[in-house]
Amino acid sequence: MKKISSVFTMFALIAAILFSGFIPQQAYAETTLTPTATNKTASIQLTSDVHTLAVINTFDGVADYLIRYKRLPDNYITKSQASALGWVASKGNLAEVAPGKSIGGDVFSNREGRLPSASGRTWREADINYVSGFRNADRLVYSSDWLIYKTTDHYATFTRIR
C-alpha cells in the first residue's frame, strides 16, 4: 500500500508541474548576467535584460543592436572597466580577465577628420570580431546621432554601414 501511495504522490507531483505552466527555461531566459568591476575582482549583477544574453561582436550584429537599443551590447566594457578587472593591453589578456567581453564605448577623437563632423557630434568606438589575445584592427565607430562606420585597417579607412 505504501508503494502505491508513493507512486500516486509522484504522479500527482509530475501532473502539477506539467499543468502549472512552469517552464524552467523561462526563468533562465529572464536573467542576464552583467559583470561589473570592483578592485580587480569581478562580480555578477542580475538584470532582466533578455536581449543581451548572447555575445554580439560582428559589424552587422553590433550596428543593428546600436540602432535598436541605442547602446552597446552587454558584452562590451570600456578600457577603464577592463583595466579595473586586470586587463593590460600590452599583455593581450582581456579574454583571461574578462571572458566573453570586448572593448567598446570609449570616445574616438576623430583627430584626422576622416569621419564627418557636426556641432555636438561625438564618436565612440567598439572592437569587432574579438575572441581572445591581442585586439585586432576591426572597429565599429558610431556617433552620438547614430551614424555608424566600420574600419578593418585600424582607422586608416572607414565605410559607412548605417
UniProtKB/Swiss-Prot annotation:
CDD domains: barnase (cd00933). Gene3D superfamilies: Microbial ribonucleases. One of its GO terms (cellular component) is extracellular region. GO terms for molecular function: RNA binding; RNA endonuclease activity. Keywords: Endonuclease, Hydrolase, Nuclease, Secreted, Signal. Pfam families: Ribonuclease. InterPro entries: Barnase, N1-like, Ribonuclease/ribotoxin. The keyword Thylakoid does not apply. Residues 1-29 form the signal peptide. It is found in: Secreted. The keyword Oxidoreductase does not apply. Its EC number is 3.1.27.-. The active site is at E125 (proton acceptor), H154 (proton donor). This is Ribonuclease. Residues 30-53 form a propeptide. It comes from the Bacteria. This is a purine-specific ribonuclease. It comes from Bacillus pumilus. Belongs to the ribonuclease N1/T1 family.
